[in-house]
Amino acid sequence: MLNVNEYFAGKVKSIGYDSGSIGRASVGVMEKGEYTFTTDRPEEMTVVTGALRVLIPGAPDWQVFTPGETFFVPERSEFNLQVAEPSAYLCKYLS
């Protein structure tokens, strides 16, 4: 089953799904902007297109991730994103 989500007045949209090979995940696109997300479970985020500038909890500085690069976000945390151009991502929800 697909779940469509929209955040930040439509600037971030995602489609969530359950996959036998990777478990629960979502794919989405972020428009240019700055965003703060919270997590319940640990997440693995992979950039598909564009670039994401991310401030991960516990990291001393912002980091830039480009297509094919992955970052991890701890459970029950908050992370910040700066997006300079429309960017796509794959998010895997880890247990």
Curated annotation (Swiss-Prot):
The keyword Cytoplasm does not apply. Keywords: Glycosyltransferase, Transferase. It catalyses: a purine D-ribonucleoside + phosphate = a purine nucleobase + alpha-D-ribose 1-phosphate; adenosine + phosphate = alpha-D-ribose 1-phosphate + adenine; cytidine + phosphate = cytosine + alpha-D-ribose 1-phosphate; guanosine + phosphate = alpha-D-ribose 1-phosphate + guanine. InterPro entries: Ppnp (IPR009664), RmlC-like_jellyroll (IPR014710), RmlC_Cupin_sf (IPR011051). GO terms for cellular component: cytosol. It is an enzyme of class 2 (transferase). One of its GO terms (molecular function) is guanosine phosphorylase activity. Its EC number is 2.4.2.1, 2.4.2.2. HAMAP family: Nucleos_phosphorylase_PpnP. Catalyzes the phosphorolysis of diverse nucleosides, yielding D-ribose 1-phosphate and the respective free bases. Can use uridine, adenosine, guanosine, cytidine, thymidine, inosine and xanthosine as substrates. Also catalyzes the reverse reactions. Belongs to the nucleoside phosphorylase PpnP family. This is Pyrimidine/purine nucleoside phosphorylase.
